[in-house]
Curated annotation (Swiss-Prot):
This is 1-deoxy-D-xylulose 5-phosphate reductoisomerase. Belongs to the DXR family. Pfam families: DXP_redisom_C (PF08436), DXP_reductoisom (PF02670), DXPR_C (PF13288). Its EC number is 1.1.1.267. Pathway: Isoprenoid biosynthesis; isopentenyl diphosphate biosynthesis via DXP pathway; isopentenyl diphosphate from 1-deoxy-D-xylulose 5-phosphate: step 1/6.
Amino acid sequence: MRALSILGSTGSIGLSTLDVVRRHKESFSVVGLAEGHDVHALAEQIKEFRPTIVSVRDENAADELKTLLGPADRPEIVHGIEGAGTVAAAEGSDMVVSAIVGAAGLTPTIKAIKAGKDIALANKETLVVAGQLVSDLVKQNGVELLPVDSEHSAIFQSLLGHRAEDVERIILTASGGPFRNTPLEEMKKAGPEQALKHPQWTMGAKITIDSATMMNKGLEVIEAHWLFNMPADRIGVVVHPQSIVHSMVEYRDGCVIAQLGSPDMRAPIAYALSYPERSESGVKKLNLAEIGTLTFEEPDMVRFPALQLAFDALKAGKTYPAVLNAANEIAVAAFLNKQIGFTDIADTVDKTMQAHEAYTPMELDEYIHADRWARQTASTFISS
């Protein structure tokens, strides 16, 4: 039996993970849960999955959770980013599902790695912000880092059984989001209601906006660089509106191996949890005859400059990826709060990157310093 701690248990990935666990209670147990926003949902999860430790956002949420649980149902309750780290390193778990949204997931994930836990990584920002540090820690601690993002899971599966030297490049697919065919002038007027209508995937608000700007794909390019040791010029992106081909690997003989499946995050989650085996995930079986047509097109870097910004950050290295991510988080939050327009998101990121004097970070604190600087700078651009 594999014992799990789930960071971000009440979010989209967390709920899908628990659905997989629910289907395979003979294979998985839950040791720890961490959430940031929905104490009532966490209380129900505690009653069903009986973790020994949970973390909530702050002391008030901890008090509220205690009132929702009887003494018999009550696990150890901790709070804050330190609490999430305690859950991540909790004794008794052997795998941590890292699904906290944004750079907030970095520190708990590092604590899990240092505690010798295998990582099922849904929090791409961990590698975007501190890819070199995290990669080094994974090697030093002898743990496995298994991708949960559908694209990286597809690449991981498409690489199995092949020699690294035979790989020509990897190709990430992107749905194109809700504005794939929207003229730029109309995109400038788009509000959160339009941007949150993803044509294929059901996800949280932040990642849905990132998909609409194509920043999500840019972050995935940086994540792929660290996961698969692939330089930027050997990572491609192609828009695939049907979201059936999840990504591809091109080999030097001209052959391309791809992984296909219905657009449902439970499939890559089940694969990461069960690896190297496979488990039934509850995902609808793929019927290609019913789908009929699969199409592909080049991404439009003019209408979606966030993707180019991510490639630029990856190529420049140093603290640029951390700054890219932090500025984007601030800009997306401002857009969701209707403080800025849709196209202002990429503009804010661009301005913040241009204002940054990059350096080579060595320690976690140096990555966090760049993250904080970018948040403050992006906030200043937005308020002005």
